[in-house]
Amino acid sequence: MLLSPKQHEFVLNANRRWNFKGGATRSGKTYLVKTLARLLKVPLAITDATSLTEAGYIGDEIESVVSKLLQAADNDVEKAERGIIFIDEIDKIAKKKETRSRDVSGESVQQGMLKLLEGSDIEVPVGATSKNAMVPQVTVNTRNILFICGGAFPDLENIIKARLNKQSSIGFNSDLKDKYDNDKNILSKVELEDLREFGMIPEFLGRLPIVFSLEGLTEDMLVKIMKEPKNAILKQYQKLLELDEVKLEFDDDALRQIAKKAMEKDTGARALRSIIEEYMLDIMYEIPKDDNIGSVTITADYIEKKGTPLIMMRGQERLPMNNAEA
């Protein structure tokens, strides 16, 4: 992820900093930015870098990101000028290695963004994302807007490994040439020169000096996501069954199996809801029909489709769900 040098009073009164963040598509970059904006109570605009093109070509003009922020601020210019703009998929506008035609969606977009990042007055339409003679325009100064750029940066790991392996193989105390080949946290060692090699132009990186990476979610993290947040999905289902005076529990092994299934889908925490809904559908339909049921326990066997949930009748011991229905 790349962060920009923007001056917000809530960021320790430090000079403004644009930020550059990198991480897998399932590492939670967008959710992190949304949470930041909500905690700071500032407007947020999210856009995809792949939709941006140089002015005059098909696609969204670069200034459209400021228009989206103005809309998020309910057309309040002062509010928008203290907001956050998150540009995702920034790796997709890397400079093309070999091209003879004008790169209107790559290097040209990076060049066009320089004006926004360095802080300038931008004329943007009110209530629209594209300029039109019939739409009134206002001036938004981008100097205090926090720009955050993020992307997955495929193949960046190989660039970092090549640099580190080359450095470690030089000198009397040289290490093995493949020392970093199995380093799982290789992205944490990223430097600006790696991003330049990837295809980000020096002028663009110069305005995004803060670079950090996000690790992919692990099974343990996914289990915590299911259990710990105030609006965790498990708590939502527990609350729904509480309305029928039924207690819902999940065995730790069951949660681990759900996390494993989510890891297999390779979409991060997004997969958790669909997986849990698959197993809870019948339970949410059948349990309210029987007023004698006091609790339901989701087991690993049920998640692995080797058994059924365990239920406890009021005043009785736990029974498999099919026995209870009988």
Regions found by a protein language model. Give the residues of each.
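Short, solvent-exposed secondary-structure boundary motifs
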Residues: 1-2, 239
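Pre-Walker A adenine-sensing motif
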Residues: 2-15
